[in-house]
Amino acid sequence: MILDKHIVVVTGASRGIGRSIAVELARQGATVIGTATSESGAEGISEALKEFGGQSRGAVLNVTDAAASEAFIDGVVKEFGGLNVLVNNAGITKDQLAMRMKDDEFDAVIDTNLRAVFRLSRAVLRPMMKARGGRIINITSVVASSGNPGQANYAAAKAGVAGMTRALAREIGSRGITVNCIAPGFIDTDMTRALNEQQIAGLLQQIPLGRFGLPEDIAAAVGFLASSHASYITGTTIHVNGGMYMS
């Protein structure tokens, strides 16, 4: 299998895109530790990964807790002897028009969607450098490039992740570590299912392919970047959005 003997951490893996990423990487042979914020979420991840055997499982982690994040990565490295792939997928939204957005709504999104990505990436650098190889894959968003009303906090965080990705790629490329982004467009998840028919119709008009993407579309792109097929790709963003945004 492509990712046989690979140790992978996927944050925010209890549902949606994160769940599909964890399942896809396990299907490719990796040992996957997927994180959730609750015990029930972690148990759901373990159940989803059970069919692939091995030691793949769910784990509880609050990515905004700096000490817990560092301890979690240290624990994975000690248990398995290393860490090959980190997928920073965990994220939240607190949408609000800018003139009404409170500081705590802005800060919460930055803390989860940007600061936590930096902390976890920093935590994996030492073991990856020691192994002289690794993959850091960050899930950003189409709105980091296109913008979106009511999402100044979310767009700022995701654009920050894209910039940080490029900086890290230049910083650690000589150690054999690649750092890339996947930028999903509108994906068929709980969030898009909550939209009304008028909102859905308006969004579909902006997408040349005429449909929302599937979580599996994002998982396939992550699987590619995690594999040896992407060994010469770093510092880039792969847009998976049906043509909604083109660069």
Model-predicted regions and their roles:
Residues 121, 157, 165:
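Active-site helix of classical SDR
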Residues 141:
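Residue(s) in the substrate-gating loop at a strand-loop-helix junction
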Residues 173, 178, 233-235, 241:
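Short, small/polar-rich loop/turn modules that mediate ligand/substrate recognition or access, typified
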